[in-house]
Amino acid sequence: MDDERRVLCPENRGLAAYVLQKKQEYAEKPKGLSENLERTFVKGYRSVCDAKDPINTLKDLSQIKGFGKWMVKLMKGYFDTAVESSEQEDLPDNRAGKKANGKKRYIPQRNSVGYALLITLHRRTTNGKEFMRKQELIDAADANGLSHAPVGPEKGKGKAGLGHSKREWYSGWSCMTTLIQKGLVVKSSNPAKYMLTVEGREVANECILRSGLPDSVDILSVDEMDPTPQAKKTPNQNPTCSFTMREELPYVDPRCRAQSAIPSDILEKFTPFGYSKEQVVAAFREVSDGSGDKDPSTLWLSVMCHLRQAEVYNSCPDSRNSKKDSSGPFKSQIRQVDLEGSRAKKFRSCNDGSTLNPCSSGSSHAVKACSSSLASDGTKGITNIPRLPPLQFGETFEEAYDVILILDDREKFATKGSRSRNIVENICSEFNIKIEVRRLPVGDCIWIARHKYLETEYVLDFIAERKNVDDMRSSIRDNRYRDQKLRLQRSGFKKLIYILEGDPNHSDAAESIKTACFTTEILEGFDVLRTHGLGETLRKYGYLTKSIYQYYKLRVNDNDQSKGAASCPSFDSFVKRCQDLDKMTISDVFAIQLMQVPQVTEEIAIAVLDMYPTLLSLASAYSHLEADVSAQEEMLRNRSNNVICASASKNIFKLVWGE
């Protein structure tokens, strides 16, 4: 009989007896002991008796054959009544008991979805709401940007026909189950209502205190801030060309790695770009931690991308005063957004009161919005200052215009009734901005200035193109990426912004995407911004809208300064200009023909078009040298000062004039 079975390990006799005791308790119940349940107890009893090692914890028991979740839970009473101090320390949930004298409280990781949900629930319920619904909570948590990952399901995941796996349908909302199991959130009613428990409110407060966040208000405009009590904190902050918002205090990693681990020849690669050794070492540390690769020689390109992204995601430590009534100081965690652009600053006078200083340090969320130029040549930066819409003499922009964000109606989040449209509406209320949806001839979003009384609309010098990682990969492969960038550059905007959603490291074309972003920013003058998903992108639009308004807000029409200066085009003229750019011209056809010639690159084709915009004009030039074939073959090379190589010059001549 099983009752008389010998226990191999004497220390397990008590556990074996406890299994038999539980079996007897179930047998004495009115329903009795079912055949399956009896078999389960017998199997578990035999396994305990045959175990050669002592079973001291529930974790040890779970590894014994015959003890599933139900049996382990049933045996918990035995371990609770045993020698608690030694046994409980070995349980996974209680290993911290040696230091904390008890079970460690569950606290979500900083910038995780659980972290964002707890703080969002805490703020809303503190401000008078008793509970929040699921979709309301998802939209609010997505909008506040406290989570690095999207809270709701991302569009494009779990597409029909591609296998409905759990991984495809997983979203950040899944962590709500953990919060409920840990006793931090209570779910009730149908449809569900979510409320914080007393412990959940304590954990939310602890998260807020650890990260330096304010208790309630996320975003404040400059007009809503009272600089007087903050003057003691951080001087020399200028709100004229920036909007302000509460920001998390930067996390300082206590670990420090030796600078000598990076070879000097690798460090010297970053010197021409103006980066300090400390910046390079810190970037190497972050990149190597994320990739697992510790070899500096293979990481330097990724580090360069990381440093450039750090410049884009920067906060401005200080700005110059331009107006007496707007020179209030602000806290160090208030975000500043630079709209002038680092290239333009190099060529502008330091006495220009409207100039913003370059950003040197800041948080991972701050936006140095627009340093783009229409050409990669740095000398063009001097003309890269955004234009003003028409103003009467002495009239400020704030008195005459409102800034409105225009989204392309072909974007998914512009569809009525979609979840993303609810996020758009939430962004409107959260940032107190106006958003409209229209058909745009180029780009995914622009900003217009609408006259408060005349209702006339003028397009401001800012345009953004948005792509997720999958779209980026496909557009690179079919050359749409190159064509779209060219359309943006030809559209006449001063500030070009490219937003990439998602992590390229998870794509099979990761290196191609990183290289494309690198060249787009470094060589072509775009501002490349990275976001984690649609919610953060819309939030980024909100930041840019506020900062653009603050940049223009106090600009005044001064005849002495605005003589000969171009003004912003009207919305109708902008649409017409873009439509005209789409029309195929004779020069465009000629350029396509030239690109089919061997040895002719894009630069060579452009050089030919600069001198001879049509095939007829080039043929006419050849006709003047008809008697000298050698001179005809060398004509393009000589007249372009060797920009066009000899082989290309000869091949073009054969195309146009050859027999």
Curated annotation (Swiss-Prot):
Give UniProt keywords alphabetically. Calcium, Cell cycle, Cell division, DNA damage, DNA recombination, DNA repair, DNA-binding, Endonuclease, Hydrolase, Magnesium, Meiosis, Metal-binding, Mitosis, Nuclease, Nucleus, Repeat
What the record says about the induction of its expression is: By DNA-damaging treatments such as MMS, cisplatin and gamma-radiation.
Q: Cofactor(s) for this protein? A: Mg(2+); Ca(2+)
What is the top EC class of this enzyme, as a single word? hydrolase
UniProt tissue specificity: Ubiquitous but preferentially expressed in young flowers buds, notably in anthers.
- This enzyme's EC code(s): 3.1.22.-
The GO cellular component terms are: condensed nuclear chromosome; nucleolus
Please list the GO biological process terms of this entry: cell division; DNA catabolic process; DNA damage response; DNA repair; double-strand break repair via homologous recombination; homologous chromosome pairing at meiosis; mitotic recombination; telomere maintenance
Subunit-level organization: Forms a heterodimer with EME1A or EME1B.
Further comment found in the protein's record: Two distinct classes of crossovers have been demonstrated in Arabidopsis. Class I is MSH4 dependent and exhibits crossover interference. Class II is MUS81 dependent and exhibits no interference.
Function noted in UniProt: Interacts with EME1 to form a DNA structure-specific endonuclease with substrate preference for branched DNA structures with a 5'-end at the branch nick. Typical substrates include 3'-flap structures, D-loops, replication forks, nicked Holliday junctions and also intact Holliday junctions with a reduced efficiency. May be required in mitosis for the processing of stalled or collapsed replication fork intermediates. Plays a role in DNA repair and in genotoxic stress-induced homologous recombination (HR) in somatic cells.
Member of which family? Belongs to the XPF family.
User: What name goes with this protein?
Assistant: Crossover junction endonuclease MUS81
The taxonomic lineage of its organism, from the top, reads:
Eukaryota, Viridiplantae, Streptophyta, Embryophyta, Tracheophyta
